[in-house]
Amino acid sequence: MHAQDKGGILPALSLLLIAVAMVSPSQAAYKLQERYSWNQLDFAFPNARLKEQALASGDYIPTNALPVGVEHFGNRLFVTVPRWRDGIPATLTYINMDHSVTGSPELIPYPDWRANTAGDCANSITTAYRIKVDECGRLWVLDTGTVGIGNTTTNPCPYAINIFDLTTNTRIRRYELPAADTNPNTFIANIAVDIGKNCDDAFAYFADELGYGLISYSWELNKSWRFSAHSYFFPDPLRGDFNVAGINFQWGEEGIFGMSLTPIRSDGYRTLYFSPLASHRQFAVSTRILRDETRTEDSYHDFVALDERGPNAHTTSRVMSDDGVELFNLIDQNAVGCWHSSMPYSPQSHGIVDRDDVGLVFPADVKIDENKNVWVLSDRMPVFLLSDLDYSDTNFRIYTAPLATLIENTVCDLRNNAYGPPNTVSIPKQAAPGHSAVGPPLYTTTNQYRSLLSQKPQTSWGPSLPSRNYLPALNGNPGIPGSRNNLNNLGAPGQVVSSVSVSTNTVGPSGIEVPKAYVFNQHNGLNYETSGPHLFPTLQPAPSQLGGGLKTYVNARQSGWWLHQQQG
């Protein structure tokens, strides 16, 4: 028996291991692990009867809901669902991860149903996009106040910052952006939060994608100001063509969008990196400038242009860890990319941490939580906007993985000697012609992160790999064990196969042209019908006295129903 093991099984096992080792990373090296997935979104209604009534009345239309933002805190995973179409019962929701470890959980309105009533400007949130939890346990949510998308957009409410205490689940502040901070084209879908010396020394930065501006908000002053019309906020006219999931479309007007913040530098400030959506380039500015209201009209040369990331490098979401690793979505490549901020900003310093031509079609949001775990939401957004999703297929996914696992053996993994950064990477502040530069450089990273990364034992280092920018296209191979997706329906290598019928035009499912990436915010003062399809009619009696289903349930506020969502 032992002789047979040595002469037959072990050599065969060795050959198997060699064969597995030769499988390309694009086929088998799935680092992100699928945590949740849905064919279509479902919501945690107070009871089955109210859900049935909402379906019958059109207050809940499952196929109209698209998740766009994700954020993690404790045992909750927050998911935002904008009100682009009718039938979205809640825009700010969460998953109780203690109750739903995996699967397709119902989304629970946060903090309750009442706070998700569309058009109730002072008390509720109409539409939320991307959100941020800060290190002080606060959830920052910008309510765009909009309902609809493209030419169907109305503005029942003004832009307002809503901040929640995640310990008490109460809103602790609401701040409306003044008229001076917006313009007729304003559309804001991204937020970055900057915590300084303490929790009161907090700023939030908002990217105005279509109004081409950057807005700063001070928690301590409870005041905001706008940096307007810098040329770096505008789209690149050569980068407005997109190809996702077999659909060719143009988002040529999309300006400043994704943002990330570095760790605090030696001068006490951070660097804000940002990119227009229609661009392959990244830009930077010190928060020393953004925190100073007096610099809104005198800061042009404080903004710095970096190189392009490489081809097919449109991005909508970016985030940086506290040790300087930036992650970002690559929507053209069905991938998540990385760059270590101690290295030059060049294509050679960028890498792919994971890619999936099925599961990561439009990775809409990327976040790093307090435990250095990465969360990625993919939603097939262009198919939803410009064609039709196949709701018998999995359309929405949330993935997760430790940050260290994702960057291992990439150009961003400085534990690997093959990718050592130069001693100093510095971009000095640019001075206006005829003037000398003053103040500290924009950033100076003299191996400031290497000491942190090198604390891990040598045995954790990955093998030396050749430098490469991007991995090749995913080649479907249903025979690979451990694949996180069912690849049985994949076609030829590199071919994206889907049962979704896609087109190359920019016409939505109802024949409405949708030339924009998201809502085109007109601020056009249109009156909003309170009895229309997006709002629940105002009803005074308690739910027990009425039979109007969810519409009644939401508006009978004196009953305190929202404190008991799980009854029934």
Swiss-Prot record:
Domain of life where this protein originates: Eukaryota
Record keywords, A-Z: Developmental protein, Glycoprotein, Secreted, Signal
GO cellular component, one term: extracellular region
Residues with glycosylation annotation: N151, N222
Localization annotation: Secreted
Signal peptide: 1-28
InterPro entries to which the protein is assigned, alphabetical: 6-blade_b-propeller_TolB-like, Royal_jelly/protein_yellow
Pfam families in the record: MRJP (PF03022)
Its biological purpose: Controls the pigmentation pattern of the adult cuticle and larval mouth parts.
Family statement drawn from the similarity comment of this UniProt entry: Belongs to the major royal jelly protein family.
Protein name: Protein yellow
Organism field: Drosophila madeirensis (Fruit fly)
Lineage of producing organism: Eukaryota, Metazoa, Ecdysozoa, Arthropoda, Hexapoda
